[in-house]
Amino acid sequence: GVDSGYNRIFCIIDMDTKDKEPELSQYQKLKKKYAEPISKPKKGIYCKVEFFETHRCTELFFLYYFRYTSRPYENQEQLLNDLNQCVVYKKANEFFRKGLHSYFERNNGSLDNAVANAERSMAEKQKDGREYTYSELGRLMTLLKEL
């Protein structure tokens, strides 16, 4: 991480594991620790750590490839059911290794739609104060394009 010489670290956080104590306090403490960039000039270290949250889980961003939702999900299984109505999805390592992005696009999904839907979820979250069904991964994708 920081000591390895990276100047930026992006952390993708599933908020369904951070909405209760003690995990919530631990996560808030971690975000506070990295709120400012790590700067140790004598060691040649400068690193900005950024957090990108999705509530309930990253699979929401995958669903956003296909359609928008602001539905509150009680658990991950409900979200996975909605995703599986759009495309066959299995939460397994071998599935992830095959290139999810191209798989979603071959099945009529779109990264541009996912980014737009994620941005919409964040705009609604800020406007309404909603604390569920949102993703900051659209902002991450935009940042990655700029690198």
Regions found by a protein language model. Give the residues of each.
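C-terminal accessory helical subdomains adjacent to catalytic cores in phosphodiester-
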Residues: 2-8, 15-147
